[in-house]
């Protein structure tokens, strides 16, 4: 089935493509445009976010018309009394949707309309069917009773001649009425469809027609027998009689109307808000007869009073307000009021009942409600989980003493603080669970694939062996002896600084067996690499130098292997040296749980010498025996490849080169793969010797070309059916990693520390850009540098890291952020050095990792603000006080220790107590001459400025602040 495109989904959901793209981005999906295709799970999520619509709005009109279709329409037997005014504007729109009238009725309506102005007096007792002669305009309708109160439901047609002829407004034509439409005809003829637009019906002569009063509670035709001739309940209305409205033969207020045939009775009613009765145009006030409508000046009557209830005929209905039309459109009732949905009512109730924190209402949990959040989530993500307003969560967080924005990535500690306040248990999804959920969204379940593999599809695979140990214990040289190569000669400083993967063949018991070796660094900075090597291996070979013994990295490698639950083979190296002691090594490793077989344990120890090529075959035999005896190594070759990226680097001619280890399946040239945030199609594969490989089977390490970027060492890779799927997985992984990094870098600023940070100024920060030859070395260097701690005054921040030569973009970034570029086994590209010199960017290059660590640590210490300490200069005893009107009190003193310096800091001590601190020696004289300093054993005169509280026997101590060297 073809995958849907964004614009197709937008059309299906009744939204624009821009809204669909925006919603997909909110859901974490990245699409390039409206023509991009999306996966079925993504389309399902979008359909859930936007329920399919498009028919709901048009369906409202037929629903509104439904009651009117079953009501009998009046027969247009007579004309409207004398209506000659300009055509009504609203009628033109309705006429287009009205049915054509009968051919025989149209001439009658036209003839009746022409005779209407000739009428001079109302015709009493004339039947509606014979209403060709109508009353003259302006004739008072004093004897006409008011139509009775409306009752819901269909009404019977009034009998002909039941009402006296009286000029009355036509129902359903009031522009201010809440509902428009015609009621039943007086002739009793039933009409199944809407009233023809070109036909006019005759009104009841001599009586005002209902449905035309803008102040009436109910609009529409009323039953003819509901209130004929009888007095209105409650007595006549005050205000005097009212003559027939002058607008009966002319235009009515609000919407001018001509004597043209009425149109559009079956069409939709005019929309727009209903005006207030107080805004209606004024009407002539006169004495109204019994049963007539009240004058506007008398004011509308509220429901519950006389004339307000059903049957009262006038005023407002008992339920108050202008109501819906009864009679003309079936069942009537009170005015149409917008009813809130149950969901809206529930949300309002929750908001009203939610406790207020910091002045805002936020939904609270019961203390056991679990909320799962991804790494680097923001307050918007948390608000979406608990159905709250993100701005309210910002207010709550400020109330708790934390400052953050709605879209800022927060760490787990901040979410735990917020969750504890609101009654939620926050669970931040681990990277493994996040990766599994990401793949499941693309219908990729690695665990289910492993469980579905049967014995018939499994095939034996070679063991993967990781060589681990302390630095300079001979791991790489041992591999050189196994492979008959000289890899160690190419290592800087003689130490391995990246992972190497090789596959060799050896003959064991007459059979050729393949073994895959992974060489890991032994330096302490490469802890992550050793842990990564232990995770992908089947057997660990622990190399220990016989002359050096067990070292810290030996114990660390041992712990990594035991944590990964892999069997260990110990290779005691350098046994050819005179001071070698293999038995000592066996005894030391026994303390860590590795008991040799000769001591009754289950760990194989082999004494080897990589330099002398001693016992290499015995070591290979031990590896194969361990694999056959303790492990059952099988994999499925007939499926999409799965594996791990061992190492990656950026080659100048070939681009991103990634060394991958296939764990299951078969990787072929042309497959679409994704490794971490890198994706692409396999263009070529090479083995460790540089030979071309067409297909890589399980446990085979190969170099892959064709990835978009350089993945990180340790990223898992998998082959997909389509490159589009690989790209989407990579983009989601990149977004998740970016959010996690932002949350990790966020410096928590509390309200208490905010003022202090502003007062102290910005904290000194050393920005670094790290470029290396391989991604594993860059990762190790970054981790080691971030562990340097010289105090809170100076911070280290890595603003960019990458693989490959230093480019102009790196220099430009360093210029903007005042950063230092560190190159690890790389050199700058062409003309980059000149640009760096011109911009004043410092670049440092290293080939050994611990040299870079030492220099960066020294630079950080140099950025520390100096510390000062108080150093005592000397003391002087006051032996006599000289009082001067010009200079104040002068102390005649004898220097007992050190020296007294002019303008130095001083304090006055009396009987062992400090009388005054932070004094300054303003004047210092030796006899009558000014002196800069006076040393021990001499007398002098000391003036302490404006401080005159000195006595004989007081001690003057002088001191100064000196910079203290930082450790």
UniProtKB/Swiss-Prot annotation:
Region ranges (G2): 494-498
Region (G5) location: 609-611
Gene Ontology terms, MF aspect: GTP binding; GTPase activity; translation initiation factor activity
Basic residues composition bias: residue spans: 334-345
UniProt keyword Lipoprotein, yes or no: no
Predominant localisation class: cytoplasm
Compositionally biased tracts (Gly residues): 184-196, 300-333
Phylogenetic placement of the source organism: Bacteria, Bacillati, Actinomycetota, Actinomycetes, Micrococcales
InterPro entries reported for this sequence: EF-G-like_DII, IF2_II, IF2_N, P-loop_NTPase, Small_GTP-bd, T_Tr_GTP-bd_dom, TF_IF2_bacterial-like, TIF_IF2
Domain annotation tr-type G: ranges: 460-632
One GO term describing the cellular component: cytosol
Annotated GTP binding sites: 469-476, 519-523, 573-576
Function: One of the essential components for the initiation of protein synthesis. Protects formylmethionyl-tRNA from spontaneous hydrolysis and promotes its binding to the 30S ribosomal subunits. Also involved in the hydrolysis of GTP during the formation of the 70S ribosomal complex.
Organism the protein comes from: Kocuria rhizophila (strain ATCC 9341 / DSM 348 / NBRC 103217 / DC2201)
Amino acid composition bias (Low complexity), ranges on this chain: 51-96, 103-154, 197-206
Pfam families: EF-G_D2, GTP_EFTU, IF-2, IF2_N
Keywords in alphabetical order: Cytoplasm, GTP-binding, Initiation factor, Nucleotide-binding, Protein biosynthesis
Domain of life: Bacteria
Region G3: start-end pairs: 519-522
Residue segments, region G1: 469-476
Family: Belongs to the TRAFAC class translation factor GTPase superfamily. Classic translation factor GTPase family. IF-2 subfamily.
Subcellular location: Cytoplasm
Keyword check for Protein biosynthesis: yes
Gene responsible for this protein: infB
Region of interest: G4: 573-576
Region Disordered, residue ranges: 34-363
Protein name as it appears in the record: Translation initiation factor IF-2
């Amino acid at each position: 089935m073809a995958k849907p495109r964004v614009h197709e989904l937008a059309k299906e959901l009744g939204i624009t493509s821009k809204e669909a793209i925006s919603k997909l981005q909110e859901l974490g999906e990245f699409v390039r445009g409206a023509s991009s295709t999306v996966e079925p799970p993504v389309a399902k999520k979008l359909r859930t976010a936007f329920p399919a619509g498009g028919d709901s709005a048009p369906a409202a009109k037929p629903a509104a018309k439904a009651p009117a279709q079953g009501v009998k329409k009046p027969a247009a037997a007579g004309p409207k009394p004398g209506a000659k005014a300009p055509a009504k504007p609203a009628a033109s729109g309705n006429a287009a949707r009205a049915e054509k009238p009968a051919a025989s009725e149209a001439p009658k309506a036209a003839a009746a309309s022409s005779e209407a102005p000739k009428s001079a007096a109302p015709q009493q007792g004339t039947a509606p069917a014979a209403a060709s002669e109508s009353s003259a305009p302006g004739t008072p309708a004093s004897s006409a009773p008011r139509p009775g109160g409306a009752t819901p439901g269909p009404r019977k047609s009034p009998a002909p001649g039941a009402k006296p002829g009286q000029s009355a407004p036509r129902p359903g034509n009031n522009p201010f009425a809440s509902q428009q439409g015609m009621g039943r005809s007086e002739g009793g003829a039933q009409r199944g469809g809407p009233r023809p637009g070109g036909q006019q019906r005759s009104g009841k002569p001599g009586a005002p027609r209902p449905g035309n009063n803008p102040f009436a509670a109910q609009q529409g035709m009323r039953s003819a027998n509901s209130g004929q001739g009888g007095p209105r309940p409650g007595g006549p209305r005050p205000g005097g009689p009212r003559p027939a409205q002058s607008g009966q033969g002319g235009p009515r207020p609000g919407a001018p109307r001509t004597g043209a045939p009425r149109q559009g009775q079956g069409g939709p009613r005019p929309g727009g808000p209903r005006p207030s009765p107080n805004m209606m145009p004024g009407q002539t006030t006169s004495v109204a007869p019994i049963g007539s409508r009240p004058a506007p000046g008398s004011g509308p009557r509220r429901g519950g009073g006389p004339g307000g209830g059903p049957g009262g005929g006038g005023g407002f209905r008992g339920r108050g307000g202008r109501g819906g039309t009864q009679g003309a459109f079936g069942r009537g009732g009170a005015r149409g009021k917008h009813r809130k949905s149950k969901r809206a009512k529930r949300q309002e109730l929750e908001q009203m009942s939610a406790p207020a924190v910091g002045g805002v209402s936020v939904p609270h949990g019961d203390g056991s409600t679990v909320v799962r959040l991804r790494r680097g989530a923001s307050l918007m993500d948390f608000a979406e989980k608990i159905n709250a307003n993100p701005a309210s969560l910002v207010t709550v967080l400020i109330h708790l003493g934390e400052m953050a924005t709605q879209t800022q990535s927060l760490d787990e500690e901040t979410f735990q603080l917020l969750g504890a306040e609101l009654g939620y248990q926050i669970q931040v999804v681990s990277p493994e669970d996040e990766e599994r959920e990401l793949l499941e969204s693309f219908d990729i379940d690695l665990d289910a694939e492993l469980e579905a593999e049967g014995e018939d599809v499994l095939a034996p695979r070679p063991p993967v062996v990781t060589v681990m140990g302390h630095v300079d214990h001979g791991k790489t040289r041992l591999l050189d002896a196994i492979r008959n190569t000289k890899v160690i000669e190419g290592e800087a400083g003689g130490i391995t600084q990246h992972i190497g993967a090789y596959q060799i063949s050896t003959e064991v018991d007459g059979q050729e067996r393949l073994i895959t070796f992974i060489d890991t660094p032994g330096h302490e900075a490469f802890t992550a690499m050793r842990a990564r090597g232990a995770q992908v291996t089947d057997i660990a070979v622990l190399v220990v130098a016989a002359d050096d013994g067990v070292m810290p990295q030996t114990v660390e490698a041992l712990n990594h292997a035991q944590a990964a639950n892999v069997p260990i083979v110990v290779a005691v190296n350098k046994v050819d040296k005179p001071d070698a002691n293999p038995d000592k090594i066996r005894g030391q490793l026994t303390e860590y749980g590795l008991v040799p077989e000769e001591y009754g344990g289950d760990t194989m120890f082999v004494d080897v010498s990589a330099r002398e090529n001693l016992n290499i075959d015995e070591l290979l035999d031990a590896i194969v025996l361990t694999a056959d005896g303790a492990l059952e190594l099988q994999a499925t070759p007939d499926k999409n490849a799965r594996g791990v990226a061992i190492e990656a680097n950026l080659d100048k001619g070939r681009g991103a080169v990634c060394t991958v280890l296939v764990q299951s399946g078969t990787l072929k040239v042309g497959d679409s793969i994704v490794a971490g945030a890198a994706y692409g199609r396999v263009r070529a594969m090479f083995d460790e010797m540089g030979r071309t490989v067409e297909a890589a089977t399980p446990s085979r390490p190969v170099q892959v070309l064709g990835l978009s970027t350089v993945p990180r060492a340790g990223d898992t890779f998998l082959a997909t059916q389509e490159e589009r799927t690989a790209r989407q997985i990579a983009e989601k992984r990149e977004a998740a990693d970016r959010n996690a990094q932002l949350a990790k870098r966020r410096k928590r600023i509390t309200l208490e520390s905010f003022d202090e940070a502003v007062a102290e100024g910005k904290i000194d920060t050393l920005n670094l850009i790290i470029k290396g030859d391989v991604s594993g070395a860059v990762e190790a260097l970054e981790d080691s540098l971030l562990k340097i701690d010289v105090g809170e005054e100076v911070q280290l921040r890595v603003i960019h890291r990458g693989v490959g030569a230093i480019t102009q973009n790196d220099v430009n970034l360093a210029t903007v952020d005042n950063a230092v570029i560190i190159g690890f086994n790389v050199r700058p590209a062409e003309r980059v050095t000149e640009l760096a010199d011109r911009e004043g960017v410092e670049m440092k290059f290293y080939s050994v990792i611990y040299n870079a660590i030492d220099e960066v640590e020294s630079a950080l210490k140099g950025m520390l603000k100096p510390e000062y300490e108080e150093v005592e200069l000397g003391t002087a005893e006051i032996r006599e006080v000289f009082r001067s009107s010009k200079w104040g009190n002068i102390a005649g003193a004898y220097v007992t220790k050190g020296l007294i310096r002019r303008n130095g800091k001083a304090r006055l001590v009396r009987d062992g107590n400090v009388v005054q601190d932070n004094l300054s020696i303003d004047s210092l004289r030796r006899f009558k001459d000014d002196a800069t300093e006076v040393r021990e054993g001499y007398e002098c005169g000391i003036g302490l400025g404006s401080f005159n509280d000195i006595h004989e026997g007081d001690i003057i101590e002088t001191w100064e602040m000196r910079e203290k060297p930082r450790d």
